Amino acid sequence: MITTTTKKKAAKKRALRSPANKAYAFKSGLALKTWRQGKGIPRPLFAQIADCSERTLATYEGKARLPVKFSRPVEESIRLILALEELAGDNAALKEWLQKPNAAFDRRTPLSLIKGGEVDVLWGMVHQIRQGAFA
């Protein structure tokens, strides 16, 4: 007999495997490291985006399982990277854009916005571009 709890667990596993979540639902540090390196994102840059030290990121990338307290910032960072990459076109353009002063952000760099806790400004820009607000 299948219980409600079993059904909920199965549904949760399916959701984590769905294409929408597959890109950023990492459970292990090695999977995160492999993804980050595959995207060509240096550890110092990803650490800045995830708002952690480079040493902390290196430690967690060596773990078999990511700690819960670290999973959320990682998932949020990966979602932001994927959204910005979609708009920038490729990894090289994104890395350059993150470090270049932008008139839309009062000559601040997008990376400085991330460091300053103003990720919502970047998400607002992503939303506006996706909706065609600048067309």
What spans do the regions from the language model cover?
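Non-transmembrane "mature" sequence context
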Residues: 1-135
